[in-house]
Amino acid sequence: MTSTRFHSLSDGRQIAFRHVAGTGPTLVFLPGYMSDMAGSKACAVVDWAAGQGRACLLLDYSGCGESPGRFADGTLSRWRDEVLALIAAYCSGPVVLIGSSMGGWLMLLVALCIPNRVAALVGIAAAPDFTAWGFSDEQQAELAAADQQAIGR
């Protein structure tokens, strides 16, 4: 396993990551909620990649694992942007996005931003939010109104 490095974002955030050089589309593992690149799934992916000579990128979202910051400051869009920054900086060519649990949701958000770079998507017990797709426009409006009322707006 390669050692942890840190990528600096323009706002000063430091994102911990490990990158293994190799061939083929880079495997990019996106951990789940409150998980990190030291977890068993991430380790299994990087070990397989190393054994096959495949490129692999692991990362810890800001506020998780080895990345500094407050977990409470994390959002899906913030973490999506962190993943996109690391892919842009360290992955040449196509990527295979592998998302575990909440990482599956991030996998889809990242794929929407860089569709021409995505060779494949692999969801491991992926937990994307599909609630908007399961409701009519009227039901979504009712839910939004109830949400606004609940938070006092």
Indicate where each model-derived feature is located.
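Gly/Ala-rich beta-loop-alpha elbow adjacent to hydrolase catalytic centers
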Residues: 99-107
